[in-house]
From Swiss-Prot:
It comes from the Bacteria. Homodimer. Part of the ribosomal stalk of the 50S ribosomal subunit. Forms a multimeric L10(L12)X complex, where L10 forms an elongated spine to which 2 to 4 L12 dimers bind in a sequential fashion. Binds GTP-bound translation factors. It holds the Pfam family Ribosomal_L12. This is Large ribosomal subunit protein bL12. InterPro entries: Ribosomal_bL12 (IPR000206), Ribosomal_bL12_C (IPR013823), Ribosomal_bL12_C/ClpS-like (IPR014719), Ribosomal_bL12_oligo (IPR008932), Ribosomal_bL12_oligo_N_sf (IPR036235). GO terms for cellular component: cytosolic large ribosomal subunit. Forms part of the ribosomal stalk which helps the ribosome interact with GTP-bound translation factors. Is thus essential for accurate translation. It comes from Rhizorhabdus wittichii (strain DSM 6014 / CCUG 31198 / JCM 15750 / NBRC 105917 / EY 4224 / RW1) (Sphingomonas wittichii). The keyword Ribosomal protein applies.
Length: 126
């Protein structure tokens, strides 16, 4: 039981980017896709249940979709925004599309998008 508690503690200490990388590695190792499971489960939960047609979105994910040929500038900006080290920021930029920030409000998401685009990146908000 102590081993399970240690595992829970270790997983809880992961950053969002580390958790995403872990998820990707587990998907490859086990031959599954977390996105497919979510896509299948989502319609079953509320299909035809009278859900509101237009949901107001108050949290956004800032997704880096490319470096626009200005990789160094984009890496610098990603480091400034996320606080990541050089290697981690470089890995994030090179593995685009990737989330730079998740669950931010609209104003902050727009600000981050503008910063990244000024550095040469292509960005989308989800």
């Amino acid at each position: 039981m102590a081993d399970l508690q240690k595992l829970v503690d270790d997983l809880s200490a992961l950053t969002v980017l580390e958790a995403a990388e872990l998820s990707k590695l587990l998907e490859e190792k086990w031959g599954v896709s977390a996105a497919a499971a979510v896509a299948v489960a989502a319609p079953a939960g509320g299909a035809g249940a009278g859900a509101p047609a237009a949901e107001v979105k108050d949290e956004f994910d800032v997704i880096l979709t490319g470096d626009g040929g200005k990789k160094i500038n984009v890496i610098k900006e990603v480091r400034a925004i996320t606080g990541l080290g050089l290697t981690e920021a470089k890995t994030l930029v090179e593995s685009a599309p990737k989330a730079v920030k998740e669950g931010v409000n609209k104003d902050e998401a727009e600000k981050l998008k503008k910063q990244l685009e000024e550095a040469g990146a292509t960005v989308e908000l989800k």
